[in-house]
Regions:
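C-terminal lobe substrate-recognition/regulatory segment of protein kinase catalytic domains
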Residues: 312-355
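Intrinsically disordered, low-complexity regulatory segments that flank or precede the catalytic domain
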Residues: 1-88, 425-426
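Conserved short submotifs of the Hanks-type protein kinase catalytic core
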Residues: 163-175
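Conserved N-lobe beta3->alphaC-helix segment of eukaryotic protein kinase catalytic domains
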Residues: 116, 121-146
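Conserved N-lobe ATP-binding subsite of Hanks-type protein kinase domains
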Residues: 104
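C-terminal intrinsically disordered, low-complexity extensions immediately downstream
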Residues: 382-426
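Activation segment signature within eukaryotic-like protein kinase domains
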Residues: 195-196
C-alpha cells in the first residue's frame, strides 16, 4: 500500500515518529466509547403543500429534534466532489519547530516529491464539542488569502485517530523575532523598507478579502533565505464583514505588545485598524531591534502607549470617552508625542508613516493600501532587493540551536471564550 493511499493499520507498517508524538491520544476504540448516542425520537410528518408533492409520494419524514433549528431544508441537486485526505505517513518527520497554544509545528519531508514542508498538528485531544474554531478559521483564512507574502497551505493530512489532523504548509526558514535576537545590529533602512512593503502588501490582500489577522507580531512573520516575508498563524483570524452578535467581537485577540488601544479599552467592535496598529508596532520593533511597547499587563501596556504618544484627548481620539474602560483610567499630564526622541535616526517621512500607523483614532489610522503609497518607500535609500539580504542559520531546520526569544504568547483564553461561537465564526 502506498503512503498516499490513506492511513495504514498499525499491523501493516512499522512504528514511526508520528506515532511517538501521539502516545497521549485516544485509541479508536476509546474514542468510539466517548461518542454519545443521540436519544431516539419518533419521526413526525411534515405537511407539504399538495401542489408541491409529486403523485404517490409519501409525506416527508424528519427527525423531530431538528425542528428547533430549521423547518425547511432546501433541496440539494449537486454535491461537490470530496477528495480524501492523505495520510500523515506520506511525510517523514524531521524535527519539531515549536509548540503554541493551538498546535505543534514539525518540519517534515514529502516522501513522494522530496519537498520540505511544515506540518501543524492541531490540538484536538481536549476538544469536547467538535473541530476547534481556531483551526477552522486558520484553514479558511489561508485558503482565502493566497498571496506571495502569506504562508501557503498545501493540504490537510490525517493520522490513525480522530485527534490526529495536520495542516501542511510551506516551510520557511526563519521568523523575524528570532532573527532580531540573533542579529548584532538592526536591519538597514533599505532592508526595513523591503520587509515593511511585503508585510503591507500581505495585510492589504487579507483586508481586501475581508480577513482580519488579529495576531500580527514579529514571531508570526516568517522569512526565507531569499528575503521574502510570509505572514503566518491565522488561528485568531476572522471575516470582519460578518454580522456581529449582541455580545460584540471578542477582546481576547492580538498578543499584548501589539494590541491596539481600542481593544485594551474594551471596544466590542473593531476593524482592520487593529491590524494596522500591530503593523506599526512591528515597524518600530524593526527600527529599534526591540519591542516598542513591552508591557507586562494591560495597564502597563496603556501606560507605555501614553508615554510615547501622549495621553488621548477629545481632539486626537473623539471616541475615547465612550469606551468601557476609559473612565477607570487616570491619564498622565498631557505632553506631545515622543516619536522623534525615541526614533532618533528616522527621516521625517519615516516618522510620519510610523505616527500614522500608531494613531489613537482607528478611523484616522492609515490603511495598508495607503501605507504602500507613502513617500517613505520612495525616498533614499531605496528598498533592497530581497535576494541581497544576508542569510542566517535556520533554527527551524535545526542548524544552530539558540536561546528562544522572550515573547508573550497569544491570548490563551481565546479558543474557549464564550463569544467564539456563532457570533464569531469565520
Amino acid at each position: 500500500m502506498s503512503d498516499a493511499a490513506g492511513p495504514s493499520t498499525p499491523s501493516s507498517r512499522k512504528r514511526s515518529k508520528w506515532d511517538i508524538t501521539d502516545d497521549d491520544s485516544l485509541s479508536p476504540k476509546q474514542e468510539q466509547s466517548l461518542i454519545k448516542k443521540r436519544p431516539k425520537v419518533k419521526n413526525i410528518r411534515i405537511h407539504e403543500p399538495e401542489q408541491l408533492r409529486p403523485p404517490n409520494k409519501p409525506p416527508l419524514l424528519v427527525d423531530k429534534s431538528l425542528l428547533s433549528y430549521s423547518k425547511y431544508v432546501p433541496p440539494r441537486t449537486h454535491h461537490p466532489p470530496l477528495t480524501s485526505s492523505r495520510s500523515v505517513y506520506s511525510y517523514e518527520r524531521l524535527n519539531q519547530i515549536e509548540e503554541g497554544s493551538y498546535g505543534v509545528v514539525f518540519r517534515a519531508k514529502d516522501k513522494q516529491t522530496g519537498d520540505i514542508v511544515a506540518l501543524k498538528k492541531l490540538k484536538l485531544d481536549e476538544e469536547k464539542y467538535g473541530f476547534p474554531i481556531t483551526a477552522l478559521r486558520e484553514i479558511n483564512a489561508l485558503i482565502a488569502c493566497r498571496h506571495e507574502n502569506v504562508v501557503g497551505i498545501r493540504e490537510i493530512v490525517v493520522g490513525e485517530t480522530l485527534t490526529q489532523v495536520y495542516i501542511v504548509m510551506d516551510f520557511v526558514e526563519h521568523d523575524l523575532k528570532s532573527l532580531l535576537t540573533l542579529m548584532p545590529q538592526p536591519f538597514l533602512q533599505s532592508e526595513i523598507k523591503t520587509l515593511m512593503r511585503q508585510l503591507l502588501s500581505a495585510v492589504a490582500h487579507c483586508h481586501k478579502n475581508w480577513i482580519l489577522h488579529r495576531d500580527l507580531k514579529t514571531s508570526n512573520l516568517l522569512m526565507n533565505n531569499r528575503g521574502t516575508i510570509k505572514v503566518a498563524d491565522f488561528g485568531l483570524a476572522r471575516r470582519y464583514g460578518d454580522p456581529v452578535g449582541l455580545g460584540g467581537m471578542t477582546q481576547l485577540v492580538v498578543t499584548l505588545w501589539y494590541r491596539a488601544p481600542e481593544i485594551l479599552l474594551g471596544a466590542t467592535t473593531y476593524s482592520t485598524a487593529v491590524d494596522m496598529w500591530s503593523v506599526g508596532c512591528i515597524f518600530g520593533e524593526l527600527l529599534l531591534k526591540e519591542p516598542v511597547f513591552p508591557g507586562k499587563n494591560e495597564m502597563e501596556q496603556l501606560s507605555l502607549i501614553f508615554k510615547l504618544l501622549g495621553p488621548p484627548t477629545q481632539l486626537s481620539w473623539p471616541g475615547y470617552a465612550g469606551l468601557p474602560l476609559s473612565k477607570s483610567l487616570n491619564l498622565p499630564i498631557a505632553h506631545a508625542p515622543q516619536f522623534r526622541q525615541r526614533f532618533t535616526y528616522m527621516t521625517v517621512a519615516g516618522i510620519d508613516l510610523l505616527s500614522r500607523l500608531l494613531t489613537y483614532d482607528p478611523g484616522k489610522r492609515i490603511t495598508a493600501e495607503e501605507a504602500l503609497q507613502h513617500p517613505y518607500f520612495s525616498e533614499s535609500p531605496p528598498p533592497k532587493h530581497p535576494d541581497l539580504f544576508s542569510s542566517f542559520p535556520s533554527v527551524a531546520a535545526g542548524e544552530k540551536p539558540r536561546r528562544k526569544p522572550d515573547s508573550p504568547a497569544a491570548p490563551h483564553g481565546a479558543a474557549k471564550y464564550q463569544l467564539l461561537t456563532e457570533l464569531d465564526l469565520p
